[in-house]
């Protein structure tokens, strides 16, 4: 099956797979991650688009998706401890802000590369709330 996707979604997916390839240690899971990453990178390389590393948004997606991974890990740890304190609330809120940044990066890729499909979000813009993002 072949499905057309917004280009920003493809780059985002590759960045997530890159992070998974670095952070997952289970050999069976890594095999699947590497297979998917190889297929998507080859498909991207077969286009006329700049390499992933040449995209201005690439480093930003790696950073944001890496932070999301860490936040989700931290949330699951606190959830397991049934610890729903201020730290939990701040981490949970940071997911919205990080996802807003992620959506903006993906949209920037879609626009700059002339993607025929562009994902739109309908969520409220939280604006200056980014100050509460974890480092």
List each model region and its residues.
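Extended, charge-rich alpha-helical interface modules
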Residues: 1-135
């Amino acid at each position: 099956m072949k499905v057309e996707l917004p280009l920003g979604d493809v780059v985002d997916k590759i960045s997530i797979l890159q992070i998974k390839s670095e952070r997952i240690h289970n050999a069976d899971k890594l095999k699947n991650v590497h297979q998917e990453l190889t297929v998507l990178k080859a498909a991207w390389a077969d286009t006329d688009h700049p390499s992933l590393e040449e995209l201005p948004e690439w480093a930003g997606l790696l950073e944001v998706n890496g932070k999301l991974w860490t936040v989700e890990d931290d949330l699951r740890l606190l959830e397991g401890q049934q610890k729903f304190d201020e730290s939990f609330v701040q981490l949970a809120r940071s997911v919205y802000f990080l996802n807003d940044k992620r959506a903006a990066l993906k949209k920037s890729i879609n626009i700059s590369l002339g993607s025929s499909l562009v994902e739109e979000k309908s969520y409220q813009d939280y604006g200056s709330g980014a100050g509460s993002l974890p480092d």
